[in-house]
């Protein structure tokens, strides 16, 4: 785990650029990026590939990028692209919708129907992983604010990037992006409206965690009625394989043994143990 190696970065970039060059000429391009890629060569790998693609295709080609909600959206990405959209659900269930909307904005730009202008607000703000669920407050409120801004005349897209908090890069953190139709002042107002509300909720965005001991004790006290509905599930947010961790943490098992909790099942990555089975 860790940054993408220089060798892997150069290979991926060369393949992407080769395909762009071979398949052109282009009226527009859609880039399905994550937005938080970090390599030993480029701390902002997504921004860099956008820049290199722009250099290759020129200023007249409309470039759109659809990003993951955990993107650490950089000013470089916004500067090099004409349109950027971000997933607005966590867990991510609107990937298709956001990609379609990005494609629609790119197509309308090519046709001359709109003139997208973007503004990225990036206050010094980080949302704890425990508070990133978009069905729960305070993220649910921030999404309502963003959607209200999107409904204003002249707005083409307004949304939030939660950021990837485990990346040690300057771009790490929450971002607030707005796209207007040819109005840079409006784009800034839209993005700032969401960013300002997030700043007001900065304490709530930090969330509160439960210790391993407390979680196990609460789970161990589950009633027979509760257990009849299914097992108690504990999520170790510090070893989330969906976020790039190795999945080999034994802290929960150690604490379960210390407390005498029985009937615990945990998935672990341990190649040596697996080889002995």
Please give the residue ranges for each predicted region.
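Conserved anion/nucleotide-ligand pocket segment
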Residues: 99, 103, 107-147
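Short, compositionally biased low-complexity segments
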Residues: 79-81, 113-121, 165-170, 193
């Amino acid at each position: 785990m860790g940054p993408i190696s220089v060798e892997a970065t150069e290979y991926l970039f060369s393949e992407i650029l080769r395909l762009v060059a071979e398949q052109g000429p282009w009226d527009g391009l859609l880039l399905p990026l994550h937005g938080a890629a970090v390599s030993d060569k480029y701390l902002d790998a997504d921004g860099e590939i956008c820049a290199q693609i722009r250099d290759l295709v020129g200023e007249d080609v409309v470039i759109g990028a659809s990003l993951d909600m955990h993107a650490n959206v950089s000013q470089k990405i916004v500067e090099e692209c004409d349109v950027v959209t971000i997933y607005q659900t966590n867990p991510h269930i609107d990937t298709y919708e956001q990609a379609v909307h990005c494609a629609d904005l790119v197509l309308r730009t090519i046709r001359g129907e709109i003139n997208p202008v973007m503004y990225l607000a990036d206050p010094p703000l980080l949302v704890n992983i425990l508070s990133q669920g978009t069905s729960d407050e305070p993220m649910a409120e921030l999404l309502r604010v963003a959607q209200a801004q999107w409904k204003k005349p002249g707005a083409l897209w307004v949304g939030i990037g939660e950021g990837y908090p485990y990346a040690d890069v300057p771009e790490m953190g929450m971002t607030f992006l707005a796209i207007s139709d040819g109005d840079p002042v409006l784009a800034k107002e839209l993005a700032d409206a969401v960013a300002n509300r997030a700043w007001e909720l900065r304490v709530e965005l930090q969330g509160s965690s439960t210790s391993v001991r407390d979680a196990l004790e609460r789970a161990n006290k589950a009633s027979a009625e509760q257990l009849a509905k299914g097992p108690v599930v504990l999520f170790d947010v510090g070893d989330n394989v969906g976020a790039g961790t190795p999945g080999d943490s034994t802290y929960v098992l150690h604490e379960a043994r210390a407390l005498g909790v029985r009937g615990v099942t945990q998935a672990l990555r341990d190649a040596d143990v697996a080889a002995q089975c």
